[in-house]
């Protein structure tokens, strides 16, 4: 099916940082588990709403065009936004589990991070079947079960694509979407996830099959919404058109890499999809895998992320000419950060949050100190005036421009 769209598809010339780090995809370990306590019941499926009628309908005034409704949590200061144009409210900062849960940090540290995040208003926790070969999901599930938080008080997202070594254990076939999600639920010890993401596009699976399978898992109560991750704008539009053609459920969100040096997709392509079809954005890697921290100066210090096993690509990036240029730009941003009374990491995260259509930014941290620093970016967001953003753009020299 050919779909025309004004969005410019991003040219992916190299593998993303997640691809490089994950490397060959090992199969997830098995896992037993039952429903988490807390009194929640099965989520509603995709059926009708019943026959009750209302005597009068009072239309609500429309929201400002392109505006994400934002509110602030009582006692925490956390800000909440709608996930795209859906009704789901998510914290504008979420906690990711990539390369940390089940691998880089201990289970005790993982529990501390989840607790600190939850107590500071974070309600969005993201994982994937491939993270640490399933151990990240298992660790997250064990913590949630031990904490006993109300299931209705947080949002769990997982991603499906790379499951195991067998041909039928990866990709976006109907078989793997259903069985992969069931495996994730077993490891998470949950009855459902709030959002299931297709963790990349799959040219070997027909789009209709993908959309029908996602609709099926939602109708079966295994997920409440579905989204995409690292899909092109054209692919997302095709999925939406397929859903509308066959009365299926369209995606509500795209997960995309976004930081000072990765801008075009989130700034130029996804806002158009947000306005046209209501697809929101959840972004990841706001610090470019720690490159935007001012800790590197063409060198790789001891005990930094670039020295961790599996991060050889980051070490090479830091020492490359392109990496050195990016580090120079980070150094140039330090005066702006000092003027705002924040760290360059806080500035970078707040900068990501200001993009149109972005519902949440996922944080990847390995200590409570890092998490608290990153949560402080919310105070910086209000200080990002148009003038400040223009100064940042001038220093970066890579602002995306419309081709209209």
UniProtKB/Swiss-Prot annotation:
This enzyme's EC code(s): 1.1.1.-
Chief location bin: cytoplasm
Keyword tags: Cytoplasm, Ion channel, Ion transport, NADP, Oxidoreductase, Potassium, Potassium transport, Transport, Voltage-gated channel
GO molecular function annotations of the record: aldo-keto reductase (NADPH) activity; potassium channel regulator activity; transmembrane transporter binding; voltage-gated potassium channel activity
Pfam families assigned to the protein according to its UniProt record, in alphabetical order: Aldo_ket_red
Residue ranges with Gly residues bias: 28-50
Composition skew (Polar residues), residue ranges: 1-14
One GO cellular component, as annotated: voltage-gated potassium channel complex
Domain of life where this protein originates: Eukaryota
Region Disordered, residue ranges: 1-78
Protein name: Voltage-gated potassium channel subunit beta-3
Active site: 131 (proton donor/acceptor)
Broadest EC class assigned to this enzyme: oxidoreductase
Entry keyword Oxidoreductase: yes
Gene: Kcnab3
Organism in which the protein naturally occurs: Rattus norvegicus (Rat)
């Amino acid at each position: 099916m050919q779909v025309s769209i004004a969005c410019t598809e991003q040219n992916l010339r190299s593998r993303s940082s997640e691809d490089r780090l994950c490397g060959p995809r090992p199969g997830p370990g098995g896992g037993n588990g039952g429903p988490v306590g807390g009194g929640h019941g099965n989520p509603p499926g995709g059926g009708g709403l019943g026959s009750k009628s209302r005597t009068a309908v009072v239309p609500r005034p429309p929201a400002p065009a392109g505006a994400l409704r934002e509110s602030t949590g009582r006692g925490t200061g956390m800000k909440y936004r709608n996930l795209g144009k859906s009704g789901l409210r998510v914290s504008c900062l979420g906690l990711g589990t990539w390369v940390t849960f089940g691998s880089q940090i201990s289970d005790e540290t993982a529990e501390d991070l989840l607790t600190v995040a939850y107590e500071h208003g974070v309600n969005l926790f993201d994982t994937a079947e491939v993270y640490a070969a399933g151990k990240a999901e298992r660790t997250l599930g064990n913590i949630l079960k031990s904490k006993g938080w109300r299931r209705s008080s947080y949002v769990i997202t997982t991603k499906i694509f790379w499951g195991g070594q067998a041909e039928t254990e990866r990709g976006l076939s109907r078989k793997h979407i259903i069985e992969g999600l069931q495996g994730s639920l077993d490891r998470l010890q949950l009855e459902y996830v709030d959002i299931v993401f297709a963790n990349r596009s799959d040219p070997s699976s027909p789009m209709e099959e993908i959309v029908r399978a996602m609709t099926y898992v939602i109708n079966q109560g295994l997920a409440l919404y579905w989204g995409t991750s690292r899909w092109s704008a054209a692919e997302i539009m095709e999925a939406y058109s397929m859903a509308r053609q066959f009365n299926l459920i369209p995606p509500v969100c795209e997960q995309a890499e976004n930081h000072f040096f990765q801008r075009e997709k989130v700034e130029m392509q996804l806002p158009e999809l947000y306005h046209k079809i209501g697809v929101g954005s959840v972004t990841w890697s706001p610090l470019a895998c720690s490159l935007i921290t001012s800790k590197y100066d063409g060198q790789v210090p001891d005990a930094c992320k670039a020295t961790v096993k599996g991060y050889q690509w980051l070490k090479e990036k830091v020492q490359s000419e392109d990496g050195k240029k990016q580090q120079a730009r980070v150094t140039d941003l330090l005066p702006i950060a000092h003027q705002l009374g924040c760290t360059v990491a806080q500035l970078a995260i707040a900068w990501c949050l200001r993009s149109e259509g972005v519902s949440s930014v996922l944080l990847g941290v390995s200590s409570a100190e890092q998490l608290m620093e990153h949560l402080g970016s919310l105070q910086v967001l209000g200080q990002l005036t148009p003038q400040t953003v223009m100064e940042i753009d001038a220093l970066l020299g890579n602002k995306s421009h419309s081709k209209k």
